[in-house]
Amino acid sequence: MQKLFIVFVLFCILRLDAEVDGRTATFCTQSICEESCKRQNKNGRCVIEAEGSLIYHLCKCY
């Protein structure tokens, strides 16, 4: 059971570091998202998107 948990955690870490359609899949924090988008002179917003059976909390700049 512990091995399965470790594999799951490693998978999540690697998956969260991967690029998804040009956006980084992370657990989005609104304040951090707004700050990173402010550098691009855009408004930032956390959105939830699904890809297959996986759900991503993404920061999108508009």
From Swiss-Prot:
Disulfide bonds join 28-46, 33-59, 37-61. Keywords: Disulfide bond, Ion channel impairing toxin, Neurotoxin, Potassium channel impairing toxin, Secreted, Signal, Toxin. The keyword Disulfide bond applies. GO terms for molecular function: potassium channel regulator activity; toxin activity. The keyword Coiled coil does not apply. It comes from the Eukaryota. GO terms for cellular component: extracellular region. Expressed by the venom gland. Residues 1-18 form the signal peptide. The record marks 62 as: Aromatic residue of the functional dyad. Its main location: secreted. The record marks 45 as: Basic residue of the functional dyad. It is found in: Secreted. May block potassium channels. Belongs to the short scorpion toxin superfamily. Potassium channel inhibitor family. Alpha-KTx 22 subfamily. Has the structural arrangement of an alpha-helix connected to antiparallel beta-sheets by disulfide bonds (CS-alpha/beta). This is Potassium channel toxin alpha-KTx 22.1. It comes from Olivierus martensii (Manchurian scorpion).
